[in-house]
Amino acid sequence: GQKVSLYNQHVNAKHPLNGYRLKNTSALHLMQGPITLFDNGTYAGDARIEDLPPGQDRLISYALDLKTEVEPTFDGGTQELSTVSLKKGTMLISRRAVEDRAYLVKNRDTKAKTILIEHPYRADWKLAEPKQSTERTRDLYRFSLAVDPGKSATLRVKETLPIQESILLSEGGIDQIAYYQQTKEVSPK
């Protein structure tokens, strides 16, 4: 297995949880239930695992990681204009909503850490930066971030949402055409 710190803003806004990726390397089916975790022979916490078939792994979280701090920031949403076109008396406008989030991770420990940052997955939104996540569950992206001892690192997550709008030109769309013709975001094509 692998020791990690697991950050989810909705679980604890400031600190990640200590975690461990447990892999069942036996030929036996491990039944669900409570387990006790030790770190270098010292009690680290208790956790509960779900059924674990042979060859599969589970992420277990068991205690707050007080030596690591995460500061999430949201730079707000913006809209970018993609295209404006005319077709059969209708103006078609394509925009893209953009959301930019950053996670500043401070490792105050004397050991390097791998932080798994959980970020909400929304089906309509497309991941723009980074291009893909380390893993994805039904409701979450998970991004892996390595942080050296006594250092900080930042993960930036940028997502886009396509928005389509159509305006019938007989509804006073001439003013709209003039507006989009003057904007610097649209190419003359």
Question: Where are the model-predicted features located?
Answer:
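Intrinsically disordered, low-complexity Ser/Thr/Pro/Gly-rich interaction regions
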Residues: 1-104, 111-124, 128-129, 133-145, ...
